[in-house]
Regions:
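Small-residue-enriched hydrophobic alpha-helices in membranes
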Residues: 1-56, 63-179
Length: 179
């Protein structure tokens, strides 16, 4: 397990950060990335172990925790643990339509339980995914859970940059649809 000092520091920060509005958490993570890049490799390993323990300690993983894991994996881990870059496997959107549906459906469902509002948010972003000949469908809640989101994000990272850019734009439109 992580060192006592790091665990204590993390616990004290958690008490300060917990009351923050959900919308403030990702910008806070973004600010923390710069400081975390200055960790020594051994400290990064401790940080990763502590983060894993904190996320798993309540026996469930929520959407923010999944996103936090993905951010750390994508933006920090390569700096401390060199890995070969992922090889692009998807050059068109067609094979990624199910993954786009999962992602956009999950994002649409985050801010509302009202199906009409969820559908409106989904439709605000769907055209920006640029699936051309294939229409995107809003998925029911049970088809866009954390496991499905994780799998979709993993596959989407293997797409060419333009597809990623389009999906980012679509995601922003979905999230922004609730005002």
């Amino acid at each position: 397990r992580a060192g006592t000092s790091l665990a204590q520091q993390t616990a004290s920060l958690r008490r300060e950060v917990a009351p923050l509005a959900v919308r403030a958490r990702l910008p806070l993570v973004n600010l923390a990335l710069a400081a975390l890049r200055n960790l020594q490799p051994a400290d990064f390993q401790k940080f990763q172990a502590t983060l894993k323990w904190l996320i798993e300690s309540d026996g469930q993983i929520d959407l923010f925790e999944l996103v936090l894991q993905k951010i750390i994996q994508r933006h920090l881990k390569p700096q401390f643990i060199p890995a070969r870059p992922a090889v692009t496997q998807f050059y068109t959107m067609k094979p990624l339509v199910p993954d786009a549906e999962v992602l956009l459906s999950a994002l649409a469902r985050v801010s509302s339980a009202d199906e009409a509002e969820v559908a409106k948010a989904f439709q605000a972003g769907a055209p920006y995914a640029r699936t051309n000949e294939v229409a995107l469908n809003l998925l029911p809640q049970n088809q866009c859970g954390l496991q499905q989101i994780d799998a979709a994000l993993t596959r989407l990272t293997l797409a060419v940059p333009q597809i990623k850019k389009n999906l980012l734009e679509a995601s922003v439109r979905v999230v922004g649809a609730d005002g």
